[in-house]
Amino acid sequence: MASRWLALLWAPVFLCVALILETASGTGDPSTKAHGHIQFSAGSVNQTAMADCRAVCGLNTSDRCDFVRRNPDCRSEAGYLDYLEGIFCYFPPNLLPLAITLYVFWLLYLFLILGVTAAKFFCPNLSAISTNLKLSHNVAGVTFLAFGNGAPDIFSALVAFSDPRTAGLAIGALFGAGVLVTTVVAGGITILHPFMAASRPFLRDIAFYMVAVFLTFTALYLGRITLTWALGYLGLYVFYVVTVIICTWVYQRQRSRSLVHSISETPELLSESEEDQMSSNTNSYDYGDEYRPLLLGRETTVQILIQALNPLDYRKWRTQSISWRVLKVVKLPVEFLLLLTVPVVDPDKDDRNWKRPLNCLQLVISPLVLVLTLQSGVYGIYEIGGLLPVWAVVVIVGTALASVTFFATSNREPPRLHWLFAFLGFLTSALWINAAATEVVNILRSLGVIFRLSNTVLGLTLLAWGNSIGDAFSDFTLARQGYPRMAFSACFGGIIFNILVGVGLGCLLQIIRNHVVEVKLEPDGLLVWVLASALGLSLIFSLVSVPLQCFQLSKAYGLCLLLFYICFLVVVLLTEFGVIHLKKA
């Protein structure tokens, strides 16, 4: 029991390693890139006098390029591409619709990158880490698995909170995803497969989520989040994890005392078969099926490398539909790049997914990816002593380590320290997700400038939809397979993690990075209050209606939730375009 609690103490550490590295690198930035025009301060956000970047569309077409280049409000603080400069300086005015179309397609592809990276590389490595730490399924589910499922949301929130101009994106995305998941996803599950909800877990999760929403609502009202407030968010999530563990322990103890009555009289938690299925889905999923070699028997090193880097299963290709093939072709470049750069450890395989030539190659490439994605590549090009850039030193050290590993191991048996590759894969995939999330936030802000939309409405629509679509399909699939209770529980468990860790960790890292005592929040007028109120109303509706139904969720309940979301979107759009507004005094 003591070892499990020790492992639990380590869990948050590994969840935050990549994020702390990213944030710590912000202090003492060796680059010459200007960051001074937007800073957090103890009293207020100190900014150089500037015009709102959204004013660019009201200028003459000949003045727009010069405006976005000179105005600090139009500059991106992170990322590899300057989307505003690209659309106003490199596309003629008559090709603006084409540029917007290209940006939208690139945005969709970035969402695809986020989904593939999280599902096939980030989550499997988190599962391997939790297995090596000997965490129980319940502890892993509310820590590592929650982090894996919410990685796009968390990284998007961290990136958005790093700049006061895009903080509205984070609030909009987290609240918008909350409304979406608690209405559309939860309602869709009950429509697909009506079921009896587990009463105590449902009440526990919805109570914690309502507290998290109330904390965020209060922070928005006060207009700031202090260090104590940020730590309170993280502390509340730790308390939630401990509560889940204690509830599970109490339930298991009760079940062990009366096994005879547990099946018929305990509808509160998942059934044993459902728990087994959940364990299978979350920890034993074979992420390597798609990449399994076609040839059996002894293979050469070159054959192992070629097969390991092949993202296409030709047997599966021949049996799939045209739509699946088209999507697969679109994903091939991403999957190949991730296979090349991100090691994956699978404890459920006999060889633990040990691919000697590829893993040795990844010892060179993965650290290189780390330094080239950290701070958008700033540290990768920094020269040590004016002699060698960091990326060159990383390549030299990685090559030496890869050579030793290659000659000290064999193709057939994984080395004793192979589990360390899970940590390397975790860090590499985390920074890939962070890089993609940075580009997503930059594109959304650019679209907001072009269409003169607030960051909040972009966050609660495009960003929330993009980050939640994968989880929605997963939950709907579980419901169709006969596990609606599991899918329904995942709805609330995931968004609790997202809002508490997304807001708490995002603000905490900015406070540490900028050496301030608080982070200022500037709500986008009435829209934020509409969003917060809608989320609160959806939770109150479920909290009241579900017990009134004796926790028997019907299709009518699901239809009511869907109708609520449609009304919410209508009110949001009417508020955004000024149809609904507060009367001026």
Curated annotation (Swiss-Prot):
<feature type="glycosylation site" description="N-linked (GlcNAc...) asparagine">
    <location>
        <position position="46"/>
    </location>
</feature>
<dbReference type="GO" id="GO:0086036">
    <property type="term" value="P:regulation of cardiac muscle cell membrane potential"/>
</dbReference>
<keyword id="KW-0739">Sodium transport</keyword>
<feature type="transmembrane region" description="Helical; Name=12">
    <location>
        <begin position="526"/>
        <end position="546"/>
    </location>
</feature>
<keyword id="KW-1133">Transmembrane helix</keyword>
<comment type="similarity">
    <text>Belongs to the Ca(2+):cation antiporter (CaCA) (TC 2.A.19) family. SLC24A subfamily.</text>
</comment>
<dbReference type="Pfam" id="PF01699">
    <property type="entry name" value="Na_Ca_ex"/>
</dbReference>
<protein>
    <recommendedName>
        <fullName>Mitochondrial sodium/calcium exchanger protein</fullName>
    </recommendedName>
</protein>
<feature type="topological domain" description="Cytoplasmic">
    <location>
        <begin position="117"/>
        <end position="140"/>
    </location>
</feature>
<dbReference type="GO" id="GO:0050796">
    <property type="term" value="P:regulation of insulin secretion"/>
</dbReference>
<feature type="transmembrane region" description="Helical; Name=2">
    <location>
        <begin position="141"/>
        <end position="161"/>
    </location>
</feature>
<dbReference type="GO" id="GO:0042803">
    <property type="term" value="F:protein homodimerization activity"/>
</dbReference>
<feature type="topological domain" description="Extracellular">
    <location>
        <begin position="547"/>
        <end position="559"/>
    </location>
</feature>
<keyword id="KW-0496">Mitochondrion</keyword>
<keyword id="KW-0915">Sodium</keyword>
<feature type="transmembrane region" description="Helical; Name=13">
    <location>
        <begin position="560"/>
        <end position="580"/>
    </location>
</feature>
<keyword id="KW-0472">Membrane</keyword>
<feature type="transmembrane region" description="Helical; Name=9">
    <location>
        <begin position="417"/>
        <end position="437"/>
    </location>
</feature>
<dbReference type="GO" id="GO:2001256">
    <property type="term" value="P:regulation of store-operated calcium entry"/>
</dbReference>
<feature type="topological domain" description="Extracellular">
    <location>
        <begin position="467"/>
        <end position="491"/>
    </location>
</feature>
<feature type="transmembrane region" description="Helical; Name=4">
    <location>
        <begin position="206"/>
        <end position="226"/>
    </location>
</feature>
<dbReference type="GO" id="GO:0051560">
    <property type="term" value="P:mitochondrial calcium ion homeostasis"/>
</dbReference>
<feature type="transmembrane region" description="Helical; Name=8">
    <location>
        <begin position="384"/>
        <end position="404"/>
    </location>
</feature>
<feature type="topological domain" description="Extracellular">
    <location>
        <begin position="27"/>
        <end position="95"/>
    </location>
</feature>
<keyword id="KW-1003">Cell membrane</keyword>
<feature type="topological domain" description="Cytoplasmic">
    <location>
        <begin position="382"/>
        <end position="383"/>
    </location>
</feature>
<keyword id="KW-0109">Calcium transport</keyword>
<dbReference type="InterPro" id="IPR051359">
    <property type="entry name" value="CaCA_antiporter"/>
</dbReference>
<feature type="topological domain" description="Cytoplasmic">
    <location>
        <begin position="190"/>
        <end position="205"/>
    </location>
</feature>
<feature type="modified residue" description="Phosphoserine; by PKA">
    <location>
        <position position="258"/>
    </location>
</feature>
<dbReference type="GO" id="GO:0042383">
    <property type="term" value="C:sarcolemma"/>
</dbReference>
<dbReference type="GO" id="GO:0006851">
    <property type="term" value="P:mitochondrial calcium ion transmembrane transport"/>
</dbReference>
<dbReference type="GO" id="GO:0005886">
    <property type="term" value="C:plasma membrane"/>
</dbReference>
<keyword id="KW-0812">Transmembrane</keyword>
<keyword id="KW-0406">Ion transport</keyword>
<dbReference type="GO" id="GO:0099093">
    <property type="term" value="P:calcium export from the mitochondrion"/>
</dbReference>
<feature type="topological domain" description="Extracellular">
    <location>
        <begin position="347"/>
        <end position="360"/>
    </location>
</feature>
<dbReference type="GO" id="GO:0035725">
    <property type="term" value="P:sodium ion transmembrane transport"/>
</dbReference>
<feature type="topological domain" description="Cytoplasmic">
    <location>
        <begin position="513"/>
        <end position="525"/>
    </location>
</feature>
<dbReference type="GO" id="GO:0031966">
    <property type="term" value="C:mitochondrial membrane"/>
</dbReference>
<keyword id="KW-0999">Mitochondrion inner membrane</keyword>
<feature type="topological domain" description="Cytoplasmic">
    <location>
        <begin position="251"/>
        <end position="325"/>
    </location>
</feature>
